[in-house]
Amino acid sequence: MPNSNVRIPPTVPSKIIDVVDQALRARLLGGSTFNSGFDSLDSVLNLQFRLHYHVIGSNGPAKPVCDVLLKESQNLEKNMSMMEELNDYPEITKLVEKILFNCLGILFFHRGQFQESQRCLLHSLKIHNNTASQKTALMEQYDRYLIVENLYYRGLVSQDINIMQNVFYKELLAHVDTIPPESNGLLFEYISLIVAKLRFNQIQDLAENFKTTVENPFILFLYMIKKFQSPLKKHIDNDDLYLKFGQNVLLKAKFPTASETNDEALEHFNVFLQYYFKFTHIKKIKVNPSWYNFIISSMEKTFQSIEVSKTAMFLFQNLSDNSNDEIKKKTFKRESILNFVNFVKYNDKYYQLHDNSHRDIISFIDAYSFILQNSSKTDSIENVFDYDNTVSTFATSLNSFYKEYNLPLMSQSESLDWLENSTRCVYPGNISKVLTNAWSTLYEIRKYQLDFLVSNNLTSYLCNAMMLSTKEKDNADVEEQEEGEEEKALRELQFKYSYTLAQQRHIETAIKTLESLILSKNPNYYKAWHLLALCRSVQEDKEMSYKIVCSVLEAMNESLQNNTLLLNDRWQFIHLKLTQLALIEEIFGTLEALETLPEVFELYATLFPDSQPELNSMGPKYSQTKEYLLQMVWIFAANMYMRTKDNDEDAKAAIKEASNVESKFKNLNCNIANGYLSIIKDEPGVALKEFETVLYYDENNLDALVGFAELIFPEELGVEETNLERYYTLSLDKKPGKRAKLTFVNDTDRSAAYARLKFLLECAILESIEAYYSPEVWWYLSLIYEKYQDDEYKNSLLKCIKYQELNPIRSLRYCNY
């Protein structure tokens, strides 16, 4: 007879399984908030999170932190036997114990107590869950991660590179031999850490060391991780080899019957290809066109494969990027989008069939980011892919994901003060990269949309990205340290955040952010200095702004002499020089500024010599060419001439020079300059024609709108007002205030002009960032509202005053290169 005293563990209720799984799923992502239904499990998961907070992406916790965490760990160990809630759940007990002893092993390692560390790690390794029937798939994933984490620290504890590598090569594939889901971030993290410690040159070496075949997709994946960690491009020689392996897998695969699933080997190989094609896309490396046939065959041999559709999305975009045939380029891009649509459709189906649970939420977010970065409104496909709707769905999904996993999220109001409200979020590396990329993608798509700027959505996107990108240089020896890719990415996010604050006219906060976050650690970040100077220029005393500009110009000149000035910094150099001229004009007068003008042309010739064609353009658009930049300089000169007496001909000549720089491209700035010159010359009809031409192509063009408004509401100053203006601005060399004005046929004609101007200005403040923050626009709106006897004129006048007081010397866009 069976022993009646043997206690049979009860079946775990499904509700308990669900909440435990959700807690483990959140922890694998790097989450910090858990409600598993077991206080002991929540406590040990929280302990593990706090330990990882000081371990992941850093050199480990400081000794005081180690001491605190070690004491808590030891208290948990003592209380294990008294945790009655675990009595009926042996699988949870073993999980808690395993996590705890891993934590103890890590803490002892970082305290330098290597023998004690090894004892705890070996104890954790011996803990086996014999109640396999009660283990869920999530528990098995979590157990696999714990074993790999344990393996990594057992390798480190040996303190011998050869022993460590032998341990890794001997054991890793015994525990994990398939590429894990991207959402299993902690397993990803430790696989990456192990790979970073391995020494090998070729894929064949790696396979031999692991005693497996080189065709193994997991081996190829490990090799790809190593390539991600290295700036070298040796992997490019393996493209044909990968294709050969893929074709071998295809030969063995067949389309599944109704009772079968897709071929595992083919799907696994496609998972590897996702990383490979993403890597080649990032590095702008062309792949073999024969991959096209491979991916088509993969589709033919699978049924609604999530993995194949995502692989195809990456591949077709790569083929599009590298095609010289415009028709093929568009066709491949369309194929990439269609495969994204399939990827989403298959994921949604999985979600519905699995109790509203995503197959791999991080992979899902990653696919959205990729397709939105590589497409635009013009790529929309009727009834299939609507770009704007896809962006909205992505934003909603991202916020829902954060809510579901209780991840820290900075709100719109909090995002206005990063220095006060920021927190450091530490997630596994692959999770951080995907989420940072997601928030950055939303910012890049919506950064020109006024409603998202005013609602503080843009600052929120950037803050949530910055919370994930916390890798910075130490303050010590700042200049000697070489900046890595992560530091550069964070610095760029910080600049965009400061720039967005300045756009919103939160000038003081922008100044604090620039000085505290960026310039204290990156003294040679020129565009941040330029933005700081523009922010400082709103102050009545322009001396601080002027000093900043002069100092940075000296530093940039030194970099130029040392031949270390990058192309975008050369553009910055020119615009910084123009900002200097604007400040000189404001402080000392226009004539003084005109004396400095020749220096700009000399600088341009030095920065962009004809003998260096690589400096001709920053990108494919005409507005990114050095010719366009030269036109901007001539237009700047023309505007300056217009502000002086008897220099109409010089202004006209400067505009002509700008037009002659490039005859193939029509620069609307030349029309705008001609319009203002025509106002000065009392030629309102010519001026109107020029402004109307610009508004036809760009209905929200600020300069054209203001010029049009000037024609309808000309400013005429009396003698006393003119003398007073000259006294306060030190502009004795400026023209009289009389301006040209339009002649109306009758009152109906005049009313129609007012109505048109009202319509244009009201549309502009709803759509254009520059127009919304322009004091001139609000001034002319107040005049119109006053004529219409609309009380809104008071509010418009207040906004005019507010934005005039916060108006920089030049547009902020001139520092953003």
From Swiss-Prot:
The keyword Membrane applies. It is a peripheral membrane protein. It comes from the Eukaryota. GO terms for biological process: protein localization to plasma membrane; protein targeting to vacuole; receptor-mediated endocytosis. Keywords: Cell membrane, Endocytosis, Membrane. InterPro entries: Endocytosis_PI4K-reg_protein, TPR-like_helical_dom_sf. Disulfide bonds: none annotated. The keyword Ubl conjugation does not apply. It is found in: Cytoplasmic granule; Cell membrane. One of its GO terms (cellular component) is nucleus. Present with 1640 molecules/cell in log phase SD medium. Belongs to the YPP1 family. Interacts with ribosomes. Involved in endocytosis. This is Cargo-transport protein YPP1.
